[in-house]
Amino acid sequence: MARWGAARMAACGPWGRNRRVGAGDAFEASEVRRDGRSRMMPACGPWGAGHGGGDPALERELSRDGSHYSISSAILPSLGARSNRRIKLRRFIISPYDRRYRIWETFLIVLVVYSAWVSPFEFGFIPKPTGALATADNVVNAFFAVDIILTFFVAYLDKMSYMLEDDPKKIAWRYSTTWLVLDVASTIPSEFARRILPSKLRSYGFFNMLRLWRLRRVSSLFSRLEKDRHFNYFWVRCAKLICVTLFAVHCAACFYYLLADRYPVPTSTWIGNYMADFHERSLWIRYVTSVYWSITTLTTVGYGDLHAENTREMIFNIFYMLFNLGLTAYLIGNMTNLVVHGTSRTRNYRDTIQAATSFGVRNQLPPRLQDQMISHISLKYRTDSEGLQQQEILDSLPKAIKSSISQYLFFHLVQNVYLFQGVSNDLIFQLVSEMKAEYFPPREDVILQNEAPTDFYILVSGSVELVEQQNGADQVIQVATSGEVVGEIGVLCYRPQLFTVRTRSLCQLLRLNRTAFLSIVQSNVGDGTIIMNNLIQFLKEQKENSVMAGVVKEIESMLARGNLDLPITLCFAVTRGDDFLLHQLLKRGMDPNESDNDGHTALHIAASKGNEQCVRLLLEYGADPNARDSEGKVPLWEALCEKHAAVVQLLVEGGADLSSGDTGLYACIAVEESDTELLNDIIHYGGDVNRARRDGTTALHRAVCDGNVQMAELLLEHGADIDKQDGNGWTPRALAEQQGHDDIQLLFRSRKAATASGHHHVPSSTTTRVAPAAAAASLIGRFNSEPMMKNMIHEDADLPSRVLPEKLRRKRVTFQNSLFGVISSSQAQRETDHPLSRGGLAATGSPNPSSGSRNAVIRVTISCPEKGNTAGKLVLLPQTLDMLLELGAKKFDFAPTKVLTVEGAEVDEVELIRDGDHLVLVSDEWDAEKMKGKS
């Protein structure tokens, strides 16, 4: 027991007897769930008192059924609360926000309603306790007696420090000095009260009136219900007002009858004058009559059939009617406020409509503009009245919740927009978080032709038409529907909007600000390149529109001339199938063997797409026809897979040899697809059928596993080895026996017998290999070059723009503020900030760090003081320090081992060397002090 008690104390925490739960601690002890609710962390004690870790089943139950009061009523942390521990209340101390304690309080409120009705009734109509009613009173009193005891164990909120006080002594002292006396007095049984009171005060209900003290619980209940989102505020307020009215009528009726019942002359009372034998009448008739007079007095109707007959009743009526004045004012004020609040939106809408109409008439606006004004105001009222104030709601939420909502609603829609095809999910998530949903009524202008490009829109629902003004008349150029984007050309190219965008029906649009968009793209240059490619491709498809054709012509002209310092790669040009741009890039000295992160070169992409002109250009500029990617694939294999015969011929003439790639992989793929034509092509262009994959599996292994007799026979005809083992030691012959392929076993036996008798000649796979036609040509090794287009000055650099018609022509747009200019500036800034890590961007926009030679020409001076050479020699910096030491050995006929600066610091990395540095090559025996002395 001692050990168990120690464990319990450890679980409750070593915080001492006067420990109090802070506001920040209490808030951290409640975990807010996604459904807007929270659950209290287990506290010590039987009411959610865990033993340190807590019961998982209990936690799940609390999590599922936790009340929203934990958020609306729980303690909020003070600013800068530093406590990060989960404080637990003391043993046997109950949190006032515990779910089960809330249930207990709700149950007591039901008993309070009973007490509120029965206490005045017993006081006015019942002379002494009788049977069932007395028993029910005692049962109710017993429950409230339990609550008195329980209150001594409920923590309270200190109003000064806003901390939960869980010290039992302080809890007891606070309760004893506040409400304990009234709670005990209202719980005393009526029988006991009659015995202790004087004879003149031994009325059955006199002491019971103290139970009305419990009504304070009902007031707190209505306060909570008014804040509860699950209950309608209007009906909660109405229910509260009705309860107040009924309680006032009930109490007044009981007091009216009490005055008549206790008056010495029964006939001189309000009820005796109307009903002389009222004592003989049933309790129900007497109660209904009393309520009738009470409610007629409350409503000031006053039929005159019942009225005060003596002084006592007159005095009571005076105070009752004064009370009625205040109650009536309270009721009318509350109901007026509720009704006015419900109609305020309609009143504001009518006022706004009237003001807009007057404005249009006063300023003689065209009818179309007036209709647009009225439609917009009407739509705004409709969205507000139907609870669609989406932007106001989103703006009131934290950024994380707002982003999650936007992603859930619009992510898939934005992902399918042509402009963002192929970009990363991170970019789409950032864009969606910045978008704002808006509603537009039919026939409203969203974008005006020639206005400044500030926003572009994505259609969520509805349709819009693109209108161009020609000869003073509007002509519909195109109709856009859900999932399409409008206004993007003006925003991305930073030019006046080309068209007027007008809604055809009720539309929901996503608006994205140009500044926010370019800010996001500037930090995602690779994705910006993809967006640029998608835009150009879209514009090229709009050949029928002269305006769009002019835009794409100007963009491509600037790209080809190199006027934009953009991260354009050969892969980018080949992916678009733009042989003109590819030729311009190659003429400017870009490496034809540059690759992306997967090792794909431009020749790989051109071969797979079957673009003969791009393949021819790349081969002419020295692209390696046998370049391998990370999977061992070569361009010739890409062309064979796609059945591009002309490209295959070009590659073979350029020296392509399939054996440079992973022919084992190729043969296995052909067998898996059961493609005899592809397998014959592999063998014809230099593939070895006996070559294994990385796991040791050959094509014959694959054919046996698939039970493909046709492919196995074809492989055997070209020299496949039936006894070659894979990585696990299995041969094709053993696999055929193990898997029970009788046809293949028979084929193997017949082939072996024919080979042994010498009657069958097995052709070697090398006998059919095609000799390269251009093997003598020297090929440049493939490396990851920097795909950067240099700025070059041309005579035609200032050609006028031919995009807009003559009558709409503006001054020439420099594109510095367009998407292209932003990407260009961002790329240049990155190179300035990181000169040692310059790299290209592949067609997908992913960074491709340079793994080849240094692109910048760096000249350094090297000297060897040990050989008496201090003047030095000017040389180009090699790629590595080892190569630099080898160069020094050749220049000075000396074997240096270290590279030092003139100050004597040793150089460990070649990237630390800058253009113009003076380097000293020395051996391990060299004394740095000698160099300092000489210097």
UniProtKB/Swiss-Prot annotation:
A GO CC term?
monoatomic ion channel complex
Q: Which residues lie within the membrane without crossing it?
A: 289-308
Signal peptide, first to last residue = none
The family database entries (SMART domains) matched by this protein are listed as:
ANK, cNMP
Which InterPro entries does the entry link to? Ankyrin_rpt, Ankyrin_rpt-contain_sf, cNMP-bd_dom, cNMP-bd_dom_sf, Ion_trans_dom, K_chnl_volt-dep_EAG/ELK/ERG, KAT/AKT, KHA_dom
Keyword Transmembrane helix on entry: yes
Q: Which residues lie on this side of the membrane: Cytoplasmic?
A: 1-106, 158-178, 227-240, 334-935
Task: Write out the ranges of the repeats annotated as ANK.
Answer: 565-594, 598-627, 631-660, 662-691, 695-724, 728-757
Q: Which residues form the KHA domain?
A: 859-935
Organism (species): Oryza sativa subsp. indica (Rice)
Protein name (Swiss-Prot/TrEMBL): Potassium channel AKT1
Identify the residues that bind a nucleoside 3',5'-cyclic phosphate.
419-538
Q: What's the stated role of this polypeptide?
A: Highly selective inward-rectifying potassium channel that mediates potassium uptake by plant roots.
State one molecular function term (GO): voltage-gated potassium channel activity
Extracellular-side stretches of the chain, per the record, are 128-136, 200-205, 262-288, 309-312
* KW Transmembrane helix (keyword) present: yes
Residues spanning the membrane: 107-127, 137-157, 179-199, 206-226, 241-261, 313-333
Q: What's the family?
A: Belongs to the potassium channel family. Plant (TC 1.A.1.4) subfamily.
Residue ranges, compositional bias (Polar residues): 845-854
Region Disordered: start-end pairs: 826-854
Q: In which tissues is it expressed?
A: Highly expressed in the epidermis and endodermis of roots, and at lower level in cells of the vasculature and the cortex. Expressed in xylem parenchyma, phloem and mesophyll cells of leaves.
